[in-house]
Amino acid sequence: MRIIVIGRTGFIAPHIVDRLCERGHDVVDDEGGVADAVVCVHAFTQEDAEAAVRLFRGRTGKLVVLSSGDVYRAYGVLKGIETRELEPVPITEDSRLRTTLYPYRNDPKFADYEKILVERTVMNVSDLPACILRLPAVYGPGDRHHRFGNWVKQMVDGSPMIQIGAGMAGWRWTHGYVENVADAIVLAATDRRTGGRIYNIGEEVVPTTRERLEAFAQIFGWSGTVEVVPDDMALDFRQDMAVSTARFRRELGYADLISVEEAVSRTIAWERSALTG
């Protein structure tokens, strides 16, 4: 297949390109050409989505757009921008979306960010089949957020104790290892059944934050203790962000190629090298 990847820099996109090439697909930079599928990595605003529709309408068989779990009402509850009524978990593709738009309006860099409007824009075009992938918290080598860097640093430093807030300790948030997420994106781009579909992406099992920390500790070989301490509850951690990925796995036969244990091991190794590099 001939596939265009828009937004080829950054954390996830290089893995997408690598996997497409490994599978024998023709990955091209020509945004003015014709393609079997287009993967739009960096569509953050309604304007971004409208530009993609204008550019590729009539020139591709499918537009795959990366979205986020922050579209769900559960995220608004967590952030305190929706009413405090909790959403049931696991969150499915049919769960309620936020009613309050622009969740990062107070941040000038992301004031116009809104994946709900991105999704709405591309899914409402009758002659441009689209597939929406709602991504989890993505981790692994190259993660500019260093999601687990603080844990690894404390383990490297030989800290006897790692503290974690009481609210976060029992909170569940779906994550995904970057190479597995890239594999899922490639499958969605190359499988002809995904047009018009919305899928959650991420690991099948969602541990609590404490359980995740303990898994890191075991794989690292850290023998300290985890201490749960009071936190200021800036977020409403009563609301889990655990999503179901059953639809994607069932409809497309998807399974993670890299185990959680191996993903954590690779992440630890990268974080350790980042500390010394």
In which residue ranges do the predicted regions lie?
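A conserved pocket-lining segment of Rossmann-fold NAD(P)-dependent short-chain dehydrogenase/reductase
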Residues: Q154-G176
